[in-house]
Amino acid sequence: MQTRNTFSWIREEITRSISVSLIIYIITRASISSAYPIFAQQNYENPREATGRIVCANCHLASKPVDIEVPQAVLPDTVFEAVVKIPYDMQLKQVLANGKKGALNVGAVLILPEGFELAPPDRISPEMKEKIGNLSFQNYRPNKKNILVIGPVPGQKYSEITFPILAPDPATNKDVHFLKYPIYVGGNRGRGQIYPDGSKSNNTVYNATAGGIISKIVRKEKGGYEITIVDPSNERQVIDIIPRGLELLVSEGESIKLDQPLTSNPNVGGFGQGDAEIVLQDPLRVQGLLFFLASVVLAQIFLVLKKKQFEKVQLSEMNF
């Protein structure tokens, strides 16, 4: 009886351990897969530096285009679309962290003027919701509602990202005025080349850390290489570690120089930034403009009628 209870206890403990391990694995995988925007959030208080450079460029080294479309002007307390376009060749495949090839993901950061923010769900129209799809936006900081981030998300489905934006109302927010405002955007496609701690990913070129002769290249069991470089002058050895997924450009017995590329460049993605302008329009100014245009049209009509009346008078006088 005691033995049976012991086995039962052991079985329960094993089951509990497996369950806990599985939960930790799932949480870890989820945090890693959604970590890219968090890299910037954890390391930079503001994603846009004083020079105007968006900090995502510190990890995504290649330059690629990005575009943004916003209305020329919006009225207070209205919802509008900010469409970020991240174009790239959909046939391209990138090197994943496990060394295999896979589809590119995309991400974006949208820096709005103070007072502008993500529109609440109940203010978004069904048509706009259809354009947004299953995207989930988040604030860069809890106290920075005007800075939004998204990604990584599948690039083949979301190379165009629609942000639903709520315009502020100066009547309720005294810090907002009827002015022309700048909007800044950054967008990337594919993985970065450098992690926030300065270490390289396997999506970049690896260079020789020393000059000399390549005496040995060992292919590691789980992928990647160990390249041994020997300096002929003093027989000093240096071992360069190449992560999995990269293609070697060198071979054993080859003479190489310091900083010479050991691998080809696998990166097919890149980062770009752009800007746009939007006017927060005063409704009274719009009404005034409409009134002015209406008065001009009426004045033109009266002039035409007056001219016709004058011509009739002249014609009648000529008949006499």
Swiss-Prot record:
The keyword Heme applies. Its main location: plastid. GO terms for molecular function: electron transfer activity; heme binding; iron ion binding. InterPro entries: Cyt-f_TM, Cyt_f, Cyt_f_lg_dom, Cyt_f_lg_dom_sf, Rudment_hybrid_motif. Its cofactor is heme. SUPFAM superfamilies: Cytochrome f subunit of the cytochrome b6f complex, transmembrane anchor, Cytochrome f, large domain, Rudiment single hybrid motif. Heme binds at residues 36, 56, 59-60. Binds 1 heme group covalently. The keyword Membrane applies. The chain crosses the membrane at residues 286-306. It is a single-pass membrane protein. Residues 1-35 form the signal peptide. It comes from the Eukaryota. One of its GO terms (cellular component) is chloroplast thylakoid membrane. HAMAP family: Cytb6_f_cytF. The 4 large subunits of the cytochrome b6-f complex are cytochrome b6, subunit IV (17 kDa polypeptide, petD), cytochrome f and the Rieske protein, while the 4 small subunits are PetG, PetL, PetM and PetN. The complex functions as a dimer. Component of the cytochrome b6-f complex, which mediates electron transfer between photosystem II (PSII) and photosystem I (PSI), cyclic electron flow around PSI, and state transitions. Belongs to the cytochrome f family. This is Cytochrome f. The lineage of its organism: Eukaryota, Viridiplantae, Streptophyta, Embryophyta, Tracheophyta. The gene is petA.
